């Protein structure tokens, strides 16, 4: 991000930009998102968008980072709540969680996956990888002490 929002109003503007971007990705596809479209969907002027982000790629990267962090945390929470569950059932549950996540956010994650080659080295990919590693280590330690 170009400028980190400090005040509540600025944080709300950034959140509106990110929500507008998510809507654009779901509606137009990530390759057809433009800053004017983000402006229209978010209700934030193009000039204000550029106060916080250098370009649309940076907006998408920030959105994907936040969504990836939330997704990873949700998976960890889901797995850790399964105290008396067989590992096979946790695997099935985790796969179902993954497919449900793909369908959530009006196709946002499906659109990102279609273009994963552009994001596979992103900070968001590293965040997901770290969460998956932590889940795997937790399960390994629990079932194979």
Indicate residue ranges for each PLM-predicted region.
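Helix-turn-helix
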Residues: 12, 16, 24-58, 62
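Short hydrophobic clusters on alpha-helical segments that form packing/core surfaces
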Residues: 17-25, 67, 71, 98
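Charged, amphipathic alpha-helical coiled-coil/dimerization segments
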Residues: 80, 104-110
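Amphipathic alpha-helical linker/stalk segments
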Residues: 63-90
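N-terminal intrinsically disordered/low-complexity leader segments
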Residues: 1-12
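Amphipathic alpha-helical packing segments from all-alpha helical-bundle domains
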Residues: 69, 73, 89-96, 100-104, ...
